Design a protein with these regions (language model features):
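C-terminal capping/lid segments that line or modulate ligand- or cofactor-binding pockets
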Residues: 53-73, 111-192
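Extended ligand-binding clefts on enzyme/binding-domain cores
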Residues: 5-117, 124-126
Length: 192
């Protein structure tokens, strides 16, 4: 759109649209596969020869973030199946502890959950209770710093990486603005 509307570069815009179509076709042809008991899901990686990696990483973009990125809707059947997989113990990057649960990353130690993953879970949810649970976990896990961290030990919020992670803080602010607009969460006027 920018190439076409701002720079009037129709030829370049056409090449980009063609490439986008080829990528979309590749995702549909090679990136969706059956994974019992979840059904058809998006693979995290594929070689196009029938080999797949099943997982999701808490970063954005991620499979969990697909509706946030407007690739599909949260009601898309393949996405719903993929989301169920991502937020389950079957995902090797999903961790559940006594303080928080959610998606982590191979980039940080096993057992650490990323606030970005919890925030993305809330941003892509239509369930007010799930959103509230996500916010409550985030509020319970900042270790008294009032900042979102890169990752947090699911059992010990004092054990975290990056004391101040602007990416997570920015997404958390976006989440709070959205839930305020929707009127689905009240932190009780505690300034949290």
């Amino acid at each position: 759109e920018i190439l076409r509307t701002v720079y009037q570069e129709e030829e370049s815009a056409g090449k980009c649209r063609k490439l986008a179509g080829e990528i979309e076709d590749g995702i549909k042809r090679y990136g969706i596969t059956e994974l019992p008991p979840f059904g058809k899901i998006y693979a995290y990686e594929t070689d196009g020869l029938g080999n797949y990696v099943f997982m999701d990483d808490a970063n954005c973009p991620s499979l969990l973030s697909l509706p946030y990125l407007e690739y599909c809707t949260a009601e898309d059947e393949v996405y719903k199946n993929t989301r169920a997989y991502i937020l389950s113990e079957e995902n090797p990057c999903y961790f559940s502890g006594s303080v928080i649960k959610g998606v982590g990353s191979p980039h940080t130690k096993k057992g650490n959950v990323w606030p970005i993953g919890i925030i993305m879970q809330a941003l892509t949810s239509g369930d007010a209770e799930e959103i509230k649970e996500c916010i409550d976990m985030l509020l319970a896990s900042h270790a008294g710093t009032d900042y979102m961290h890169e990752s947090i030990n699911a059992d010990d919020p004092e054990d975290y990486t990056r004391s101040w992670f602007a990416w997570a803080n920015s997404l958390f602010a976006e989440l709070l603005i959205r839930v305020k607009e929707l009127g689905i969460y009240d932190a009780g006027g505690k300034g949290q």
